[in-house]
Swiss-Prot record:
GO terms for molecular function: ATP binding; metal ion binding; riboflavin kinase activity. Mg(2+) binds at residues 46, 48. Pathway: Cofactor biosynthesis; FMN biosynthesis; FMN from riboflavin (ATP route): step 1/1. This is Riboflavin kinase. The gene is fmn1. Catalyzes the phosphorylation of riboflavin (vitamin B2) to form flavin mononucleotide (FMN) coenzyme.
Length: 237
């Protein structure tokens, strides 16, 4: 089903070869709580990063909607972590195909370590419990600015990570590789128009990042996909 697109915006941003100068930008920090509107009013949860001296450049960048890649250092206790050990009685955890692939790869590495290093299952579980987390990559779309619809007086960086999560991740480390600009901020006549535009922004991000010049190599290759050419090593190092 096609999404509303009253302004006839394109689904693809930038050339197929990849981001153009001055992109990509980098940003990192711990996820903080925001205005509390993303999930409650919009149904679009956001993970906010502080606009501080560590990310001073963001104070002067044009306000608007950007897109790119996010990496989250989810602890082993988080249900969406590739290191997560699901309790026998727990409910199924929602995972998108990328998360499933990353978890399968980690499980294969764990099994290989057990076979090669002689690590028993009890000891392996202990090692996983002590793990502080592992960087996992997701596409993202983000707003930088004041959000005219809500008349914010404080400049913010609100990130919508394009994935399904079974729990929040406040306090988790997040890194962003911002690859392009989608559109300017604008005011809306009503909440529905704002939500429709955000959903279309997400589709723009998904389509644009699916091209090999925009896809980070560190994601690996799934069946039917081309290997990415964009250097995303900073996201996971």
């Amino acid at each position: 089903m096609s999404l509303p697109n009253p302004d006839n915006r394109p689904l693809l941003i930038g050339p197929p070869t990849g981001p153009e100068a001055p992109f990509p930008f980098r940003m990192e920090g711990e996820v903080i709580s925001g205005f509390g509107r993303g999930s409650k009013e919009l149904g679009i949860p956001t993970a906010n990063l502080p606009v501080d001296d560590e990310n001073a450049w963001i104070k002067n960048i044009d306000s608007g909607i950007y897109f790119g890649w996010a990496s989250l250092k989810l602890p082993a206790s988080h249900p969406n972590s590739v290191l997560y050990q699901k309790p026998p009685t727990s409910e199924p955890v929602m995972m998108d195909p990328v998360q499933q692939q990353q978890q399968q790869q980690q499980q294969q590495r764990n099994q290989q370590q057990q076979q090669e290093g002689g690590v028993g299952s009890a000891q392996q579980e202990k090692l996983v419990d002590q793990e502080t987390g592992q960087w996992q990559i997701y596409p993202m779309v983000m707003s930088i600015g004041y959000n005219p619809f809500y008349k914010n007086t404080v400049r913010s960086a609100e990130v919508h990570v394009l994935g399904e999560f079974a729990a929040d991740f406040y306090g988790v480390g997040m890194r962003l590789l911002i690859t392009g600009f989608i559109r300017n901020e604008k005011d809306y006549s009503g909440l529905e128009a704002l939500i429709a535009d955000i959903h279309f922004d997400c589709e723009v991000a998904r389509h644009s990042l699916a091209r090999k010049g925009w896809r980070v190599r560190e994601l690996g290759v799934k069946e039917g996909e081309e290997e990415g050419e964009l250097d995303g090593s900073w996201l996971v190092r």
